[in-house]
Curated annotation (Swiss-Prot):
Region (RNA-binding) residue spans: 214-249
The protein's name: Non-structural protein 2
Originating species: Rotavirus B (isolate RVB/Human/China/ADRV/1982) (RV-B)
GO molecular function, one term: RNA binding
EC category: hydrolase
């Protein structure tokens, strides 16, 4: 199962703008603004859309009583207990705070969250790979606000991912119908949870069936499982990592992969061995 981190693990909104998050101090969580109290009571009712409520909680300013010497205590409903390397936390937090000093950027950031984000929770692995791009001073994310926001939003499934919004990776093949990316293991100083082996993703360049791309993917990925999970690209998974997936996840992936192949009959010859291996 994918490990998650929250936007509130990094920054918290206040009346004077955004400040660093202090997850360690839990005693001050009792202090709430009137709006935060109402949101907490609504959140307790399991019938409500909790993902939407978490977004509202993040965008709700915290009162000064939640301030500590290190930052602001986030509401317990929107933080995680994920063990995060300090290098990852510092890099992402500093980048966000520097970006949000500009009022126009802050307004666009909040509009993006309220209109596109399905939740404040992100994939820890995706965010770690995003941080690797921030670490690279030559990366275009450091120079283009729009591209940076799209790449950041992709970590939260806020936009449909493309090869341009992916985290740190290498282009290893380019055919007439697709681009293949290689994702190497995340360095320990950025990694949350268990390490993942090298895997690959295929991004089609059009709506046509990427036959040549699939042949190239099969060549570079070797004996890895191919899966389609509904995000517009095909991903490989090393077979030993299938053991970490739940039965529910495996059934869902198999169903989506078979649906994909039913609409792309020419690819059956290339990838059918991977689908059948799950029987």
């Amino acid at each position: 199962m994918t490990q998650s981190v929250s936007l509130s693990d990094f920054i918290v909104k206040t009346e004077d703008g955004y400040m660093p998050s202090d997850r360690e101090c839990i005693a001050l969580d009792r202090y709430l603004s009137k709006e935060q109290k109402e949101l907490r009571e609504t959140f307790k009712d399991g019938k409500n859309d909790r993902a939407a409520l978490r977004i509202k909680m993040f965008l709700c300013p915290s009162p000064s009583r939640r301030f500590t010497q290190h930052g602001v205590v986030p509401m317990r409903e929107i933080k995680t207990n994920t063990d995060m390397p300090s290098t990852l936390w510092t890099l992402v937090t500093d980048w966000l705070l520097n970006l949000l000093q500009d009022e126009e950027n802050q307004e666009m950031f909040e509009d993006f969250i309220s209109s596109k984000f399905p939740d404040v929770l992100a994939s820890a692995d995706k965010l770690a790979r995003f941080a690797q791009r921030l670490e690279d001073r030559k990366d275009v994310l450091r120079k283009n606000f729009g591209k940076a926001m799209n790449a950041f939003g992709a970590c939260f499934w806020a936009i449909k991912p493309t090869f341009a919004t992916e985290g740190k990776c290498n282009v290893v093949r380019a055919s007439d119908d697709s681009i293949i990316l290689e994702f190497q293991p995340v360095p320990e100083y950025f990694r949350c949870g268990k390490s993942k082996a090298t895997f690959y993703k295929l991004y089609p360049l059009s709506d046509e069936q990427p036959v040549n791309g699939m042949l190239a993917l099969k060549a570079v990925a070797g004996n890895q499982f191919f899966m389609y999970h509904g995000h517009g690209h095909i991903r490989t998974v090393p077979y030993h990592e299938l053991l970490t997936l739940s039965n529910h996840s495996l059934v869902k992936i198999k169903k989506r992969s078979k649906t994909f192949l039913n609409h792309h009959s020419q690819l059956n010859v290339v990838v059918n061995f991977s689908i059948c291996s799950m029987e």
